[in-house]
C-alpha cells in the first residue's frame, strides 16, 4: 500500500520536505524516484532545511554524493545527498558505500533511488514522484518502507 501527498508548487514541495524531516532518524535512507524535473531535489532541499542545513543544496549529478552538516538540534549529524543517475551498474552504486555513510548518525537521500533499490530497498524509505502537470506533483510513499513511523507519515500525507 502507498500513501500520497499532493503539492501544487515548488514552495509546497519544499514545505513538505521540511515537515518530512521531522520524522527522520539517524541511519535513515530515502530512495527518491521520478522523472527528470519531478521534484526529487526540491523535496531534498526542504528536508535539508528541516534538518538545519545552512548551505545551498543542489543535485549532486556530477559529484554523485554531497555531504551537508545538519544542526545539532535535528539529532542528525550529516545529510548525505546522492544522485545515482550517471552510474552504470549496481557495483558502481555499491562502491559509493551509501549504507555506511549513515552509520555515524547521518541520513542519506538518493535521487534515482530505484537504481539503488536492489542494494538498499529493504532498509530504505521508498518515495516516488508523479508529475500531474507543470506545478502539481504527487509524492507517493510505500508505507511498508517507513517502519514504526507509519502514523507520522500518515499524518504528513493528510496535509
Q: Where would I find each of the regions flagged by the language model?
A:
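Phosphate-binding P-loop
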Residues: 21-27
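Short beta-strand-centered segment that lines the nucleotide-binding/catalytic pocket of NTP-utilizing
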Residues: 53-68
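Hydrophobic anchor at the beta1->P-loop junction of P-loop NTPases
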Residues: 30-32
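Short phosphate-coordinating micro-motif centered on Lys-Gly-acidic
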Residues: 3-4, 91, 99-159
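N-terminal pre-Walker A segment at the start of P-loop NTPase domains
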Residues: 1-19
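P-loop (Walker A) phosphate-binding loop of NTP-binding proteins
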Residues: 35
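Conserved nucleotide-sensing/catalytic segment adjacent to the nucleotide-binding pocket
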Residues: 56, 69-112
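Conserved lysine of the Walker
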Residues: 40
Amino acid at each position: 500500500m502507498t500513501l500520497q501527498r499532493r503539492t501544487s508548487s515548488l514552495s509546497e514541495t519544499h514545505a513538505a520536505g521540511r515537515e518530512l524531516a521531522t520524522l527522520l532518524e539517524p541511519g535513515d535512507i530515502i530512495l527518491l524516484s521520478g522523472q527528470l524535473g519531478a521534484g526529487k531535489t526540491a523535496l531534498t532541499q526542504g528536508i535539508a532545511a528541516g534538518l538545519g542545513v545552512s548551505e545551498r543544496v543542489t543535485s549532486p549529478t556530477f559529484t554523485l554524493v554531497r555531504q551537508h552538516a545538519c544542526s545539532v538540534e535535528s539529532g542528525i549529524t550529516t545529510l548525505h545527498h546522492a544522485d545515482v543517475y550517471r552510474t552504470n551498474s549496481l557495483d558502481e552504486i555499491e562502491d559509493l558505500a551509501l549504507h555506511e555513510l549513515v552509520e555515524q548518525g547521518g541520513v542519506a537521500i538518493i535521487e534515482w533511488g530505484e537504481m539503488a533499490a536492489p542494494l538498499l530497498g529493504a532498509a530504505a524509505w521508498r518515495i516516488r514522484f508523479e508529475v500531474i502537470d507543470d506545478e502539481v506533483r504527487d509524492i507517493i510513499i510505500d508505507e511498508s518502507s517507513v517502519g514504526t513511523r507509519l502514523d507520522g507519515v500518515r499524518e504528513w500525507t493528510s496535509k
